[in-house]
């Protein structure tokens, strides 16, 4: 079993220090095989915010925790126009990582992160053709029994984001991106951006989308909440490429604790899900099914 912690939208500069400390302690105690951070490490891409994010990440690395980190749209300067258009991810590269499309592989999983942040948009993201070619190339030599995981900040598909039924935009070049993910044989796609937890089978979101399970993370440490959904992150146990467990670990105001626990299995009809534990009882998640999308 491969244990993966999936955090997103840390937003240093608009963070709660108590929650940052609690998340660090949680990770150090459980020691995941890999910690994935799917973008928006900072609130406004300021140097002081990158230094805060870097210090936190470096403490995890110093403790021996492997990490795979990608930028988000908030890691591109918004008001500093010179850097926004000429060097959009210069500070990210200086303080976090030079690698914008990191790759991780062990005996059980292969994981690729792709940068969807762009300087010409405020909040939207996209993938370019070179990244789609990289997606295909990286996974081409991967053994078929390994679980293939794609990480982006912006989700490949439109997602429900509001209580009134509002839906987000899909990532730019959506059709080509979905085709590339399908051809690469992606089993799980992790993303963030909307500060909402969500999971749904790709094949139920678009025709010819392939067999991936789409998993969204909420904001792990930010005070910027959507629909009063509390801070949270995902805790995945990957048994095989066709069987995973997903726990949503939720901040209850004093500590992180399990908010939901769902097992997913891929059968002939697609992904099926069932609750391993009772549905969430915390904050805005109360009373909702533990998997937020129909699977």
Question: Each predicted region: which residue ranges?
Answer:
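N-terminal active-site segment of His-dependent metallophosphoesterases
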Residues: 1-59, 79, 100
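Active-site neighborhood of phospho(di)ester-bond hydrolases with catalytic His/Asp-centered motifs
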Residues: 7-8, 34-40, 66-73, 115, ...
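Active-site environment of divalent metal-dependent phosphoester hydrolases
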Residues: 13-18, 43-47, 70-81, 119-123, ...
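Extended active-site neighborhood of metal-dependent phosphoesterases/phosphodiesterases
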Residues: 51-137, 180, 207, 235
């Amino acid at each position: 079993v491969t244990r993966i912690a999936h955090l997103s939208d840390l937003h240093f500069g608009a963070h709660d220090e108590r929650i940052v400390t609690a998340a660090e302690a949680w990770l150090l105690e459980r020691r995941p095989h890999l910690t994935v951070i799917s973008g928006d490490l900072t609130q406004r891409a300021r140097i002081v915010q990158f230094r805060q994010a870097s210090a936190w990440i470096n403490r995890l690395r110093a403790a021996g925790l492997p990490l795979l980190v990608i930028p988000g749209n908030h890691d591109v300067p918004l008001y500093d126009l010179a850097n926004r258009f000429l060097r959009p991810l210069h500070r990210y590269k200086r303080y976090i990582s030079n690698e914008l499309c990191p790759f991780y592989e062990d005996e059980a999983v292969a994981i690729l992160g792709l940068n969807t942040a762009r300087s010409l948009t405020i909040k939207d993201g996209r993938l370019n053709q070179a990244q789609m070619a990289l997606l295909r190339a990286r996974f081409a030599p991967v053994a078929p029994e390994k679980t293939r995981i794609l990480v982006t900040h912006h989700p490949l598909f439109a997602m429900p984001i509001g209580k009134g039924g509002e839906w987000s935009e899909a990532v730019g070049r959506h059709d080509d991106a979905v085709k590339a993910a399908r051809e690469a044989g992606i089993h799980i796609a992790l993303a963030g951006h909307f500060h909402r937890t969500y999971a749904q089978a790709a094949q139920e979101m678009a025709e010819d989308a392939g067999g991936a399970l789409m998993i969204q993370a909420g904001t792990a440490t930010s005070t910027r909440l959507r629909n009063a959904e509390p801070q949270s992150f995902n805790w995945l146990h990957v048994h095989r490429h066709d069987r995973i467990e997903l726990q949503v670990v939720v901040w209850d105001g004093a500590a992180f604790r399990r908010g939901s626990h769902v097992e997913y299995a891929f059968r002939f009809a697609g992904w099926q899900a069932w609750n391993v534990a009772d549905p969430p009882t915390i904050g805005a998640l109360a009373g909702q099914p533990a998997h937020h999308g129909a699977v």
